[in-house]
Amino acid sequence: MTHARAIVCLLAAALPGVHAQQPSQPTRAFHDLGHAILRELIEVNTTGSVGNTTTAAQQLASRFEDAGFAAADVQVVGPTGKNRNLVVRYRGTGAHKPVLLLAHLDVVEAKRADWTYDPFVLTEKDGYFYGRGTQDQKGGAATLVTTLLRLKAEKWVPDRDLILALTAGEEGGMPYNGVEWLLKEKRALIDAEYAINVDAGGGELDKGKHTMFDVQAAEKVFHSVSLTATNSGGHSSLPRRDNAIYALAGALDRLGRFDFPVKPSEVVKAYFGKAAAVATPAVAADMRRVANGSADAATYARLSKVPMYNAQLRTTCVATMLEGGHAPNALPQMARAKVNCRMLPGEDPANVERTIVRVINDTSVHLAPIDTAVPSPVVPLRTDLLAAVDASTRAIWGPMPIVPTMETGATDGIYLRNAGVPVYGFSGLFIATDDVRAHGRDERILIKSYDDALDFTYDLLKRVSAPPARAR
């Protein structure tokens, strides 16, 4: 008997039958399986430099095959041998179109010297799991894998197929993006009515209290430009007024003091309306004004002092990199800055570029686009999915606001949205607002939070894959 089959058999024995009216109570066997899968994922290096997502995908594929999934429903695919994707189909009755469950296997780089513990060993310490990817985003991936194995052990028959896609290339540093490749080359494997992406949204902890649960329904558009000032230069002992570094510095100063216009979308209005429930009275009043359309310039000015609120309300452009000069005793012949914009959905990149040129107001500083902006359409809020999320959060943690959000960063959901598949981003992991360590040193999650996320994912997937009478 394989190790994977032993765990699944233990799990099956510990869980009540599928015909019970209530979902099975959380069991130690279920959580132990989840811990084992998380450990397995963390301890496979999947960075872009020396890592390998294929190894992680193949190990998980063996677990699914040992659990009774048909070989045709467990596929490790991709254009390269080193960094492939895992796609698993949990077959249902076909009464409804499938739901896609999305996570990525790759992680950002981590240097052992920077960490207290080895980033590629799952370390348990003081109630936390430490390891690269615990927050971003192997923790979320492990909850999906564990839950599908649990449902299989219980012989759960969903009313739609549940498709799991664990992909490569989300963090960059790999020759391709897994979701983009699957849509182009293997669309039938992942085509779905909608997708749940566990790389966005989720719960917020404030001083140990579960305050609210975010559901991502939109994300901003990534677009970078360069600003370059040039000059004939000369000897530094003979300074001139037309200095390339000064010209660029002045342009960046003017850009830094500029705010793009406020344009709250329906998702953003819904976000402020829901988030008001957990804000201080003064902030809550401003949030409600945004939600009901009565906000004035003073309201927006107050909210914009908070970076998160500011980023929800408008397009932002910020200098992120600088280079210039060629010798310490020479006048600079060139100074260049990279400016990263996060545009509101629907914003025209050309219009943003024209605005930057107008704001910097210096013909000696030239703008050039660095990349081609990929549109990110806003998806309609599904009342059935929001109701399921609300019911599942209540079952695990009690009532709290379910808050539609716009992701200020970027996720793989952008490829699916552009392909016509609505994407909603959330996971069951609650992370303290002052302990966000994704991409940082000593990345960690609370073990209790991870166990709760396992229970939440199980409860939610039963709700979205069965009529209400069977879901609970």
Question: Language-model segments: what does each one mean?
Answer:
Residues Q22-R132, L151-R160, V339:
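Acidic/His- and Gly-rich active-site-bordering loop/insert found
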Residues E180-W181, S232, S237-P261:
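A short core secondary-structure module
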Residues R5-P16:
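Bacterial N-terminal signal peptides
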Residues D242, V352-I360:
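Short amphipathic alpha-helices in soluble, non-transmembrane regions
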Residues H35-T46, K125, T228-N231, S364, ...:
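Acidic/histidine-rich, surface-exposed loop or edge segments in extracytoplasmic proteins
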